[in-house]
């Protein structure tokens, strides 16, 4: 009889290359795929294919982003790379492609540069939990002491932004040399690539899956079913829900209502359990149709609270991206789209010395909504005005 096919189910991890322009991010990405293709663990994606990244849209913003995938003996990786500096900022803020760990690429010839710092700051703000350093172009530096110096500078930079600078793995090599090396995986030039992959396998832990987090479902729609009660529908963002589970309805006021989900349905069939990613309807015990609305969330008790004021990193769209043509100042009142909630808010605080925000800027700001919404650190949102997206942001701190 035919043998069963052996399917490997390796843990999945999302990573990305970050760092200053021309330090070799795309070259390194290409080199990883080339090396692993020689071991049968990836498809080789050449540099020019990575560099001409396709456009995708996230929260109304166009971003150029390349996705490659590859495997090591231990894991399956999805790896993102962006060609332009602005694309990185937009990606990190919109969370178009989130990272469980980042590979910070620093050229030995330059050391840390302004964008190196900006990417590390953003990675910290959006909570990229782990950082690995690849010091690139080491073949172009004759003095080993200079490379040591660059390593010290990078470790110091990471420590400034609360990464464990002393513990972060630092790999030194040349991505270009690996890319140009012969097709023998044991060739000397691939050593740093293997070291980098080992560091990724061992230093970045398996991420917690969405399904294992506390339950949360943004409410998209509300129905009343005669004789049965009120049903709310939406896509489960995280966790799992079973009939009989207690939940809270949160948002649009400071009052939190407790209820029990008596039935979970998908395509009109009852489910034993709904999990992250499922589009479901939840029947709620003792809740009238007018007591719950779109923009609220259904969540595990105590897992999230309603808030009005928060700090956020925001990217403001350029005119060419369909954004505003003019700057705005403190007191600007656009609409904030947070999950399914659409709520007016005011920019109540800008950094010291910043009087106005120009289209194309990336800035930290304090925002106050007219009513509370379920918000937490790391929450992504869109800013809209007159029916068009003018910005995107990520919550960095909840104030009240």
UniProtKB/Swiss-Prot annotation:
Enzyme class, UniProt record, top EC level: hydrolase
Entry's Gene Ontology molecular function annotations: GTP binding; GTPase activity; translation elongation factor activity
Chain residue ranges for the region called G3: 81-84
Superkingdom of this protein's organism: Bacteria
Pfam families recorded: GTP_EFTU (PF00009), GTP_EFTU_D2 (PF03144), GTP_EFTU_D3 (PF03143)
Reaction(s) this enzyme catalyzes, per UniProt: GTP + H2O = GDP + phosphate + H(+)
Alphabetical keyword list: Cytoplasm, Elongation factor, GTP-binding, Hydrolase, Magnesium, Metal-binding, Nucleotide-binding, Protein biosynthesis
Gene: tuf
Stored InterPro entries: EF-Tu_GTP-bd, EF-Tu_GTPase, EFTu-like_2, EFTU_2, G_TR_CS, P-loop_NTPase, Small_GTP-bd, T_Tr_GTP-bd_dom
GO cellular component: cytosol
Function statement: GTP hydrolase that promotes the GTP-dependent binding of aminoacyl-tRNA to the A-site of ribosomes during protein biosynthesis.
Main location: cytoplasm
Binding site for Mg(2+): 26
KW Isomerase (keyword) present: no
Subunit structure: Monomer.
Full protein name: Elongation factor Tu
Residue segments, region G5: 174-176
Membrane-spanning segments: none
Cellular localization per UniProt: Cytoplasm
E.C. no: 3.6.5.3
Binding positions (GTP): 19-26, 81-85, 136-139
Classification lineage: Bacteria, Thermotogati, Thermotogota, Thermotogae, Thermotogales
Tagged with keyword Membrane: no
G2, as annotated region: 60-64
Ranges for domain tr-type G: 10-208
Family stated for the protein in its record: Belongs to the TRAFAC class translation factor GTPase superfamily. Classic translation factor GTPase family. EF-Tu/EF-1A subfamily.
Region (G1): 19-26
Region (G4): 136-139
